[in-house]
């Protein structure tokens, strides 16, 4: 009795061909993509720009024409100050290399400190605060739009697959008519 053996490669090719032929793979991928993109776990809230406010550093709201007790405040976050800071940081590196000595065995006093009292006092008088956001968005409204888009997209995907198959069948029929 002869047994027909089908290799795994042929079996995989059969299923892959079946999925592509029916458009099922395309449909499954699109639906999964839409569902994963509609995940409410992460939302973009702003345009991504970084607004640096130097008033925070001095705790003052200096208006136009006022002087600050912090003279470098107007130059903060400029390329010249960044360049100067990088130069000063690189100047100290050779000096620090010379002073390092890894042969000495030193024990840090913090390892011997008794931190039990500090740990017990952590969060004793803690009261959580709700910090108001600058933009007010409702997650439920956003989720409704995701579901509306999902419900509209699924029939459109099915329609596109159906029309694509019809178009492919029509082309095949025309090609077969020309050859016969």
Curated annotation (Swiss-Prot):
Entries under InterPro entries matching the protein: EssA/YueC
Source taxon at top rank: Bacteria
Name of the protein this chain belongs to: Uncharacterized protein CA_C3712
Species in which this protein is naturally found: Clostridium acetobutylicum (strain ATCC 824 / DSM 792 / JCM 1419 / IAM 19013 / LMG 5710 / NBRC 13948 / NRRL B-527 / VKM B-1787 / 2291 / W)
